């Protein structure tokens, strides 16, 4: 998995007025949930801010990254956990990061990449990707940049379900019956099948 560095500044004032002022100046309020726990057993949270520009390459991309967070000079390995967007302008309102514990598995969404020319496509069908990303659970250093699904032997009207896939070191979290991709019958393929059946 690729890594990306993001520089942030610790926030001392996290009130509404300060947050509004921060956003007005093209800053994004962020929270890092650490591996350390507080007295209630909850992850210790660090509030910090990042310039909007500094988040673009992380947010607006099909790729997944380990984030090297540089908060006032302190480097922490983290993953992007959640983003809130403005409902009208799509501006980034808030970002949550989780610090990586190298000894514990993390859950991430990994892009799916279809490989091969499906038999069903050669027969006139259309290949449709239903799930663009799959949720995986694994140690962060074994999570790939993408999950490759070989569709070469996929026939007309056939599907690939999550339960049919397996990757070394990864646990797939999605429902086993969820359809990842399918070769759908087109009008031309239906016509050809009807003609062949006569």
UniProtKB/Swiss-Prot annotation:
Gene3D superfamilies: Ribosomal protein L25, beta domain, Ribosomal Protein L25, Chain P. One of its GO terms (biological process) is translation. Keywords: Ribonucleoprotein, Ribosomal protein, RNA-binding, rRNA-binding. GO terms for molecular function: 5S rRNA binding; structural constituent of ribosome. GO terms for cellular component: cytosolic large ribosomal subunit. Pfam families: Ribosomal_L25p, Ribosomal_TL5_C. It comes from the Bacteria. Signal peptide: none annotated. Belongs to the bacterial ribosomal protein bL25 family. CTC subfamily. This is one of the proteins that binds to the 5S RNA in the ribosome where it forms part of the central protuberance. Part of the 50S ribosomal subunit; part of the 5S rRNA/L5/L18/L25 subcomplex. Contacts the 5S rRNA. Binds to the 5S rRNA independently of L5 and L18. This is Large ribosomal subunit protein bL25. It comes from Phocaeicola vulgatus (strain ATCC 8482 / DSM 1447 / JCM 5826 / CCUG 4940 / NBRC 14291 / NCTC 11154) (Bacteroides vulgatus).
């Amino acid at each position: 998995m690729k890594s990306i560095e993001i520089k942030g500044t610790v926030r001392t004032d996290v009130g509404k007025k300060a947050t509004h002022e921060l956003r007005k100046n093209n800053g994004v309020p962020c929270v890092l949930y650490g591996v350390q726990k507080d007295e209630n057993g909850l992850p210790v949270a660090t509030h910090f801010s990042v310039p909007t520009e500094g988040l673009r390459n992380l947010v607006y991309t099909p790729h997944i990254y380990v984030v090297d967070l540089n908060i006032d000079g302190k480097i922490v390995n983290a993953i992007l956990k959640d983003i809130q967007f403005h409902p009208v302008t799509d501006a980034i309102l808030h970002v949550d990061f989780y610090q990586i514990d190298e000894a514990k598995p993390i859950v991430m969404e990994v892009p799916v990449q279809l490989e091969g020319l499906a038999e069903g496509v050669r027969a006139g069908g259309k290949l449709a990707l239903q799930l663009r990303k799959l949720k995986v659970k694994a140690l962060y250093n074994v999570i790939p940049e993408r999950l490759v699904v070989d569709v070469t032997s996929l026939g007309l009207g056939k599907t690939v379900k999550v339960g049919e896939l397996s990757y070394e070191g990864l646990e797939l979290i999605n429902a086993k019956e969820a359809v990842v991709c399918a070769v759908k019958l087109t009008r031309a393929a239906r016509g050809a099948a009807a003609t062949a059946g006569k």
